[in-house]
């Protein structure tokens, strides 16, 4: 008869509570680090540790996150900036590493060039949510490989010769685009987990609604309420804490140009929601439904909506109150009353603001924010820099950096935003999108373009990035080379590619060596005792022509 198979438990029951208490103490010690001095966590160390498994895993993302924090902390304190751009593929990441200290992975670029479904499209975040983490992995694995390759080359040379060899830090921290999180809070947590597993040092997440997400420079953006986006930021931090990683969370707000919001549930959003001030109009949705049922379509429906909107006289509630104050014959000193109202109503809910107006003797105000709601049920909102500042202040305790998406590279607006945030949180790091969607030639003269990053850095924008520079530079050289190649054949390759590579010392000119052929030969020789008749870089390799 076979003996009973004894299987060990996952953890010794007599030690379980002691191990838990020890790990909780370690987490509390971790959270006491100055790194977290501005971070608010609405959960406990006990809750975090209880969500971990018994096997402790050390993620490379943690080392990269610490490195990124050190970079941004140093830049912010010196009112300097780390600036980078969206990287497309491994060739690009190795060239960026020579000159830039961070790497960006764009959702827009991934959507158009690297969807995990292989179906390209615009930046609507409708690609599988593994897409951007997979691109992070693609680049991070390349970073690790080229770091190994370079280290081997240096250690294979005498110390006296190493000054002639490259000593590039290929392990530049990667910051990636998490869009809106691709779903609810558990989706945000799973996405965060993927980014950490793939090697990201930081991620940014925006306050748009997931089903209607748009590129920051498209129309039709729909915001979620402030509390919903805070929950996303908390979800990111909680997941990173469970995994023991210092991942940076960057909060992006699209409030500057947004026109819609999903709900009026958060009082912090109330001051920016638009209401109809014309009591003679029926609700827009009712009007549109009636028109549809009568057979109207397309342009006819649009004309009906446009006419309704023109008559509705949509306003923020505060603006409606001030207009009533200024037009009321019963109010003496309307300027003083308006100032008192605006000061008292700041940050208040609509119900509270109505009560304040009434207490100051303001006549009853007709203001209906349900009447203009869209067919999808969204409320209309008047965005702007003030709306973005309001949201940034709410996000600050939960975010390592904050980014306001903007329509133009407007220094004065960037200054207004920075000063608004820093009036409440002076140590808040800021990020800025140096977008290729802007027409830089018409936006500012060349000398101002050259100083723009530096001027923004002085305001606290310590991380700046061109989202799609990888895409545009690839398109530019591809168009230029393809055109010339079609006209002059191999002369185009020599003049436009190979000769400039050699003159500028671009290492990819020796593409076999760049790809790691020498390194892999040495791996093979190590295994076979030092000799390999099939070495890739042996006698006859054509790269000898470039010595």
Curated annotation (Swiss-Prot):
Homotetramer. PANTHER family: BIFUNCTIONAL GLYOXYLATE CYCLE PROTEIN, ISOCITRATE LYASE/MALATE SYNTHASE. The keyword Protease does not apply. Catalyzes the formation of succinate and glyoxylate from isocitrate, a key step of the glyoxylate cycle, which operates as an anaplerotic route for replenishing the tricarboxylic acid cycle. Required for growth on ethanol or acetate, but dispensable when fermentable carbon sources are available. Also acts on 2-methylisocitrate. It comes from Pyricularia oryzae (strain Y34) (Rice blast fungus). Its EC number is 4.1.3.1, 4.1.3.30. This is Isocitrate lyase. The active site is at residue 215. It is found in: Glyoxysome. The gene is ICL1. Disulfide bonds: none annotated. Pathway: Carbohydrate metabolism; glyoxylate cycle; (S)-malate from isocitrate: step 1/2.
């Amino acid at each position: 008869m076979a003996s009973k198979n004894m299987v060990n438990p996952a953890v010794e029951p007599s030690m379980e509570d002691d191990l838990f208490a020890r790990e909780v103490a370690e987490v509390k010690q971790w959270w006491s680090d100055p790194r977290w001095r501005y971070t608010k966590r609405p959960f406990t160390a006990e809750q975090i540790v209880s969500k971990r498994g018994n096997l402790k895993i050390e993620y490379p993302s943690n080392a990269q996150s610490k490195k990124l924090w050190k970079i941004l902390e140093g830049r912010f304190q010196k009112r300097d900036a780390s600036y980078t751009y969206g990287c497309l593929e491994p060739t690009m990441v190795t060239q960026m590493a020579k000159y830039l200290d961070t790497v960006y992975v764009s959702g827009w670029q991934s959507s158009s060039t690297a969807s995990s479904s292989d179906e390209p499209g615009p930046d609507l975040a409708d690609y599988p949510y593994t897409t951007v983490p997979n691109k992070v992995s693609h680049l991070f694995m390349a970073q690790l490989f080229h770091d190994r390759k370079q280290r081997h080359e240096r250690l294979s040379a005498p110390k006296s010769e190493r000054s002639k060899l490259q000593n590039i830090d290929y392990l530049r921290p990667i910051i990636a685009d998490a869009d809106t999180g691709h779903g609810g809070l558990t989706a945000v947590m799973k996405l965060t987990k993927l980014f950490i597993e793939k090697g990201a040092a930081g991620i940014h997440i925006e306050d748009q609604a997931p089903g209607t997400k748009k590129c920051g420079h498209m129309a039709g953006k729909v915001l979620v309420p402030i509390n919903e986006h805070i929950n996303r930021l908390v979800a990111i931090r909680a997941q990173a804490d469970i995994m023991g990683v210092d991942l940076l969370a960057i909060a992006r707000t699209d409030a500057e140009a947004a026109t819609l919001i999903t709900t009026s549930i958060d009082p912090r959003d109330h001051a920016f929601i638009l209401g109809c001030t014309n009591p003679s109009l029926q609700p827009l949705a009712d009007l549109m439904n009636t028109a549809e049922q009568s057979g109207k379509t397309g342009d006819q429906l649009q004309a009906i909506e446009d006419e309704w909107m023109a008559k509705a006289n949509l306003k923020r509630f505060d603006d409606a109150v001030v207009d009533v104050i200024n037009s009321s014959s019963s109010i003496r000193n309307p300027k003083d009353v308006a100032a008192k109202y605006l000061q008292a109503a700041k940050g208040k809910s609509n119900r509270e603001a109505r009560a304040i107006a009434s207490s100051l003797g303001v006549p009853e105000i007709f203001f209906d924010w349900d009447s203009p709601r869209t067919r999808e049920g969204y409320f209309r909102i008047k965005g702007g820099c003030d709306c973005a500042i309001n949201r940034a202040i709410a996000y600050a305790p939960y975010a390592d950096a904050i980014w306001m998406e903007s329509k133009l590279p407007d220094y004065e607006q960037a200054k207004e935003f920075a000063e608004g945030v820093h009036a409440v949180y002076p140590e808040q790091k800021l990020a800025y999108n140096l977008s290729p969607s802007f027409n830089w030639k018409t936006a500012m003269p060349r000398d101002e373009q050259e100083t723009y990053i530096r001027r923004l850095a002085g305001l606290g924008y310590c991380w700046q990035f061109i989202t799609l520079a990888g895409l545009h530079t690839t398109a530019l050289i591809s168009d230029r080379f393809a055109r010339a190649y079609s006209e002059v054949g191999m002369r185009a390759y020599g003049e436009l590619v190979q000769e400039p590579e050699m003159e500028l010392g671009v290492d990819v000119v020796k593409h076999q060596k760049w790809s790691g052929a020498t390194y892999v030969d040495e791996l093979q020789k190590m295994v076979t005792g030092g000799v390999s008749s099939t070495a890739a870089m042996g006698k006859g390799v054509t790269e000898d022509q470039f010595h």
